[in-house]
């Protein structure tokens, strides 16, 4: 799942999505 979020945040084409998933991704990676 982390890869999925990273892939969507890499192009930063969707800042809204990236920002919305950023916290979830951060928690997933840190947890």
Swiss-Prot record:
Q: Can you tell me where the transmembrane regions are?
A: none
The GO molecular function terms of this record are: serine-type endopeptidase inhibitor activity
Give the signal sequence positions.
none
Q: Which residues form the BPTI/Kunitz inhibitor domain?
A: 1-31
Q: Which UniProt keywords apply?
A: Disulfide bond, Protease inhibitor, Serine protease inhibitor
Domain of life the protein comes from: Eukaryota
- The site feature described as Reactive bond is recorded at 19-20
- Which purpose does this protein serve, as stated in its record? Serine protease inhibitor. Inhibits trypsin, elastase, plasmin and kallikrein.
Q: What is this protein called?
A: Kunitz-type serine protease inhibitor RsTIQ2
Query: What taxonomic classification does the UniProt entry list for its organism?
Result: Eukaryota, Metazoa, Ecdysozoa, Arthropoda, Chelicerata
